[in-house]
From Swiss-Prot:
Homotetramer. The gene is pyk. GO terms for molecular function: ATP binding; kinase activity; magnesium ion binding; potassium ion binding; pyruvate kinase activity. Pathway: Carbohydrate degradation; glycolysis; pyruvate from D-glyceraldehyde 3-phosphate: step 5/5. The record marks 218 as: Transition state stabilizer. It comes from Corynebacterium glutamicum (strain ATCC 13032 / DSM 20300 / JCM 1318 / BCRC 11384 / CCUG 27702 / LMG 3730 / NBRC 12168 / NCIMB 10025 / NRRL B-2784 / 534). Belongs to the pyruvate kinase family. Its cofactor is Mg(2+); K(+). This is Pyruvate kinase.
């Protein structure tokens, strides 16, 4: 059986060519991430075109995710591009626009001198370098280096515990969001989500642009952890972005936040991505550490829909080897491991139908579960149950097919609109009997809505034998 957990790859200089992206798709990339913290609009547009071309050449559904920078606080630029801060040194972080030196560098957060107070921590580059505020002098925050290390242009700064006042969407984010929607991306990821209301800000701009796509909440702030379930309900999917999360909340809490987020997302049929430093050592090395292999496998066994690669594919030495390695780890975890069953009891019609379809298919030892969907909702409700049976999803909507590239286990087929159950079964026969792994007489359990084409109308389970016009059950 094909790998069920999806792989998200961040695009960047290491794969910035038509051939590089085609090879990523062939290696196993399911979703391409355009990181708007780096690159410019022409770069992202070119990568977008290459992904669409690669998907067409391979016949695979490949989603494209635009990841907005969000109100990320960063250092400015250094005259020499980089420097190394040693323990005990005094560094001035200024809100003035200056060319950075070893001792003084600017920040993008213009209220820092107002908000900072002695004792506050400033963590640079996902916490690799640590500073403590000693005093504030005018526009400069005077800091002592308590954890030294290299720093370079535009590195991120986290301010754990500091009450900061930044909007959910910066002016840059709004420009990038409008550009990404016009470009045609399949998902928008919103960084540093703090409240369920943040989703409404994105939806407002989407409505102005006349195009709605799924919005992914990146869980990186303590406020998001506190409001985890309301945020999951307000957004279409979630990403456990462990880099910033691990410096904003105590490091030891991150594994349990990951497990809680996955559990809540599964209960609500929302796709969930686990991200950051999954195979980080492979940016430089040809093999991952044992801890990294365990990390990927545990994300799979927690029930994640997707695992994400960042610098490993965007700037790594051998991005193709990284994707193949991750795919092997995932496959082995899926083959010999087991995802815990959902303890959540469904109380909606669609939820109960999806549970029942899974149970019927497994009890009858069917060859596969088949879902017909116009919105993707039916497929997501079946996928969250993590059946050992293949999940084959038919949709007449190209955008939904791309969206389901992020959903666990979903193998998608684009089909013409169907008008009744007989049409559905003909489409199933046409597609599956052309595949070597399926034969006439194979049993399929089909879950769909009747009449077809009505969003949110999942109300039918149908047991079908491939190539057989006689329906043996309709429940």
């Amino acid at each position: 059986m094909d790998r069920r957990t999806k792989i998200v790859c961040t695009l960047g200089p290491a794969v910035a060519s038509a051939d590089g992206i085609l090879r990523l798709v062939e290696d196993g990339m399911d979703v391409a991430r355009l990181n708007f913290s780096h690159g410019d609009h022409p770069d992202h547009e070119q990568n977008y075109k290459w992904v669409r071309e690669a998907a067409e050449k391979t016949g695979r559904a490949v989603g494209i995710l635009a990841d907005l920078q969000g109100p990320k606080i960063r250092l400015g630029r250094f005259t020499d591009g980089a420097t190394v801060w040693e323990n005990g040194e005094t560094i001035r972080i200024t809100v003035d626009d200056v060319e950075g030196t070893h001792d003084r560098v600017s920040t993008t957060y213009k209220n820092l001198a107002k908000d900072a107070k002695p004792g506050d921590r400033l963590l640079v580059d996902d916490g690799k370098v640590g500073l403590v505020c000693v005093s504030v002098e005018g526009n400069d925050v005077i800091c002592e280096v308590v954890e030294g290390g290299p720093v370079s242009n535009n590195k991120g700064v986290s301010l754990p515990g500091m009450d900061i006042s930044v909007p959910a969407l910066s002016e840059k984010d709004i420009r990038d969001l409008r550009f990404a929607l016009k470009l045609g991306v399949d998902f928008i990821a919103l960084s540093f989500v703090r409240s369920p209301a943040d989703a409404e800000l994105v939806h407002k701009i989407m409505d102005e642009e006349g195009r709605r796509v799924p919005v992914i909440a990146k869980l990186e702030k303590p406020e998001a952890v506190t409001s985890l379930e309301p945020i999951v309900l307000a957004f279409d999917a979630v990403m456990v972005a462990r880099g910033d999360l691990g410096v904003e909340v105590p490091l030891e809490e991150v594994p349990l936040v990951q497990k809680r987020a996955i559990q809540i997302a599964r209960e609500n049929a929302k796709p969930v991505i686990v991200a950051t430093q999954m195979l980080d050592s492979m940016i430089e090395n040809s093999r991952p550490t044992r801890a990294e292999a365990s990390d990927v496998a545990n994300a799979v066994l927690d029930g994640a829909d997707a695992v994400m690669l960042s610098g490993e594919t965007s700037v790594g030495k051998d991005p193709h080897n990284v994707v193949r390695t991750m795919s092997r780890i995932v496959r082995f975890a899926e083959t010999d491991g087991r995802v815990p069953d959902l303890t959540h009891i469904p109380r909606t019609k669609r939820g109960v139908i999806s549970y029942s379809a899974r149970d019927i298919a497994e009890r009858l030892n069917a060859r596969a579960l088949v879902a017909f969907t116009t919105s993707g909702d039916t497929a997501k409700r079946v996928a969250r149950l993590h059946s050992h049976l293949p999940l084959l999803v038919f949709t007449p909507n190209e955008a939904v097919r791309s969206e389901l590239a992020l959903t666990w286990g979903a193998t998608t087929f684009l089909c013409p609109p169907v008008s009744d159950t007989d049409d559905m079964m003909r489409e199933v026969d046409r597609a599956l009997l052309a595949m070597p792994e399926y034969n006439k007489g194979d049993m399929m359990v089909v879950v769909a809505g009747s009449p077809p084409g009505v969003t949110g109308n999942t109300n039918m389970i149908h047991v079908h034998l491939l190539g057989d016009d006689t329906r043996i059950a309709k429940l």
